[in-house]
Amino acid sequence: DVLPMAGEYVAAVLQEGIAKFVEGTQPAGVDTSTVVDTVARISGYKAKAAELLGEPVPPRPPGFCVGCPERPVFSAMKLVEQETGPFHVSADIGCHTFSTLPPFNMGNTVLGYGLGLASSTGVGPNFGNRVVSIMGDGGFWHNGLTTGVANAIFNKDDSVLMIFNNGYTSATGAQHIPSTGTNARLEPTGQDIVSALKGVGVKWIKRVRTYHVSEMRKVLGDAMTTKEGGLKVIIADGECMLAVQRKKKPVDRKAVADGDRVVRSRFGVDEACCTGDHSCVRLSGCPSLTIKSSGDPLKSDPVAHVDEGCVACGLCGENAHAATLCPSFYRADVVQNPTAFDRMVERWRRRYISWLG
C-alpha cells in the first residue's frame, strides 16, 4: 500500500509512494537513501513554510486554465439561468467537468466520456424545462455522436446540447481528433462536427465563439425557450489556450529577437472605478482575476486585480459587458520594438493627458 486508492496522483503523493516502495523492497546494490532523504527534505520545507505562515497553505482546487475557452460558456450559462430559472446540466468527462466546482457549480450528473447527452435523455422528462448536455469535441467523436446525438434524434429528444470545439482532446494532452484537421501524422482529414450532425438528422445548429459571452447568452437563451422541438445543438468554438500559447510564444520571442514590432495585450482593473462587490470574480473564476487591498482608507473592501498570469483572453471585459457590471476593466497594449510612428503617438498621448490635468 504505497499509493492511495483515491485522489489525485500529484508529485508529492508519487514521491512519498516511491519512497515507501523503495524502503520496503530494499533492492540489492541500490542506495535508497537519496530517495528517502529527498522526500524527508521536501516534507521539512512544507512544515517550515506552514510554521512561518502561521497556518496551513490553502488548498489549490482544480479548475480551468487561465484563458480557457470553455470558462466563458459557463459564465453565459449562469446568466441564462437568471432569466430562465435553474435547469439540469448533464456534464461529461473532459476539462469542462471543472464546471461542477465553484464558482459555477454546474453539472448535476457525470456518466462517462461522451455520454452527457445519452444520460440527459433518461432524466429530461422529469423536469419542467429543457435540460442542457455538455460534450467536448473529443467526447463527441469517441461516443457522443452515436450513443448521444443519433439516439436523441431517433427518440425525438427535446433538449440542448453544447459541444465544445477546442480542436483537440485537451484534457489528456492535446491529442488530435477527427475534427482537428490533421491526424497524428499531420495528414489532412476531411471530417467536421457540423457535417456529422447533419448526417444523423440534426436541424437546429448554431455556432458561437466561446469568448463572445453576450452572443452565447442570447443563443443559449433562444435554445432554451424556442417553440421548435427536437435536439438543439450549439457548437462553442474556441481553441485550447494551452495550444494557442505553445504556438504563439515561440513566434513572439523570435520576432522580438529579430527586432520586429510585437504587441502584447494585458487587461487590468481601474481601482478607482472598482466597487469591490467582486461579481466579476464570481462570474468567471479566472485564476488571474483576484483581489487586493485598495490602499484607500475610505474604501475598506478589497478591489479586483488582474495579475501577471493574464493571457488577454478578454473574458473579464466580456462578462462585465454581458452582465452590466461596473466599467472598471481596461485593456493595455504593450508594444515591443515600437516603430517611429508608435513613439510619436505615445508622445502625443502623454502630452494630451498632461493637458487634461
What annotation goes with each model-predicted range?
Residues 1-8, 58, 63-70, 106-113, ...:
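Hydrophobic alpha-helical scaffolding
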Residues 31-116, 126:
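Active-site diphosphate/adenylate-binding microenvironment
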Residues 36-78, 242-258, 262-286, 307-314:
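Charge-patterned, long linear interaction tracts outside catalytic cores
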Residues 13, 238-239, 244-245, 250-251, ...:
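Iron-sulfur cluster-binding cysteine motifs and their immediate structural context
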Residues 1-61, 204, 213, 217-220, ...:
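Peripheral docking tails and interdomain loops at the edges
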